[in-house]
Amino acid sequence: MKYILLGLLLMVVLANANRLADPNCGVCTLRSICLMEKESCPKGFKCCAFKKTGQTRLEKLQEDAVYEKTKRIKLNKSKIK
């Protein structure tokens, strides 16, 4: 019984460690890279689809940051008008 409980505890610890390695998505905890598109991801994260374009994770994050910044600037300009 003790070994079963230790095994379950080890599985929980490993699952949480894998989730912390890729904090963008809590759904795909058993995969190191999420392969879903943002629209199909249950949590709506942009952790995905960069493998299809050949981008690295850093390039994808930088592209997303630029997109969010330009979207925010356009929104602020529309509020000023």
Curated annotation (Swiss-Prot):
Q: What PTM annotation applies here?
A: Contains 3 disulfide bonds.
Signal peptide stretch: 1-17
Q: Name one GO cellular component term.
A: extracellular region
A Gene Ontology molecular-function term?
Answer: toxin activity
Kindly list the cysteine pairs connected by disulfide bridges: none
Primary location recorded for the protein, binned into one broad class: secreted
Query: Could you tell me in which tissues this protein is expressed?
Result: Expressed by the venom gland.
Cellular location(s): Secreted
Q: Which key words tag this protein in UniProt?
A: Disulfide bond, Secreted, Signal, Toxin
Keyword set includes Cytoplasm: no
Q: Which family does it belong to?
A: Belongs to the scutigerotoxin-02 family.
Q: What is this protein called?
A: U-scutigerotoxin(02)-Tl2a
What does the record give as the organism's lineage?
A: Eukaryota, Metazoa, Ecdysozoa, Arthropoda, Myriapoda
